[in-house]
């Protein structure tokens, strides 16, 4: 414990709060279970929401491929055979005149 009896960890996770959560969980589960049976599927949003991480990753890959294929010509690595790759055709620029 810290000085003065103040425990900063208790602000984040106190035993009373954990017990309240446990009691609420037990109360909620009791409403779905009877003496003879306990429902396996609890009411509420289902875990199978129709969209999975695989679908999201495939969508991102399609977007990345489209952006790659539709990039502007100045960002493409290769150039046309007749077109020079730089303004000086690979040569050093001329030296400035000496006065």
From Swiss-Prot:
UniProt keywords, alphabetically: Endoplasmic reticulum, Membrane, Transmembrane, Transmembrane helix
Highest taxon of source: Eukaryota
Keyword Endoplasmic reticulum: yes
Cytoplasmic side: 71-99
Region of interest (Disordered), residue spans: 77-99
Gene symbol of the encoding locus: Smim14
GO cellular component terms, A-Z: endoplasmic reticulum; endoplasmic reticulum membrane
Protein name per Swiss-Prot or TrEMBL: Small integral membrane protein 14
Entry's localization field: Endoplasmic reticulum membrane
Regions of this protein lying in the Lumenal compartment: 1-49
């Amino acid at each position: 414990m810290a000085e003065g009896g103040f425990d900063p960890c208790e602000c984040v996770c106190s035993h009373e709060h954990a017990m309240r959560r446990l009691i609420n969980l037990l109360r909620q589960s009791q409403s779905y279970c009877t003496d003879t049976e306990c429902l396996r599927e609890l009411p509420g949003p289902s875990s199978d929401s129709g969209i999975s991480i695989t679908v999201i990753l495939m969508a991102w890959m399609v977007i990345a491929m489209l952006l790659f294929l539709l990039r502007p010509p100045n960002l493409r690595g290769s150039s046309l055979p007749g077109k020079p790759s730089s303004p000086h055709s690979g040569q050093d620029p001329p030296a400035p005149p000496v006065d």
